[in-house]
């Protein structure tokens, strides 16, 4: 069973991603959510996350900076970057 973290500042997008994951049939133990990279980094420091979906553009800390900072962590999740940015 996998633990998933969704990092997205727009609530509707977070809910959509969560719904798609739940309908995928992949065995998921926990789906966690947060709305910025700072909070995500704190979660990643405290909990082993298997898969992370992250937006690129977010307030406080964007997805690019989050991915750069998490490289120093002991466990680095499989990361999927998502964005509506043109």
How does the language model describe each region?
Residues 76-86:
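A short, hydrophobic beta-strand element within the central beta-sheet of small alpha/beta folds
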Residues 58:
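Receiver (REC) domain active-site loop signature in two-component systems and cognate sites
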Residues 8, 55:
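Active-site residues of response regulator receiver
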Residues 25, 45-48, 70-76:
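Conserved phosphotransfer cores of two-component systems
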Residues 10-32:
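Two-component/phosphorelay signaling modules centered on CheY-like receiver
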Residues 41-44, 53, 67:
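Hydrophobic alpha-helical motif in two-component signaling modules
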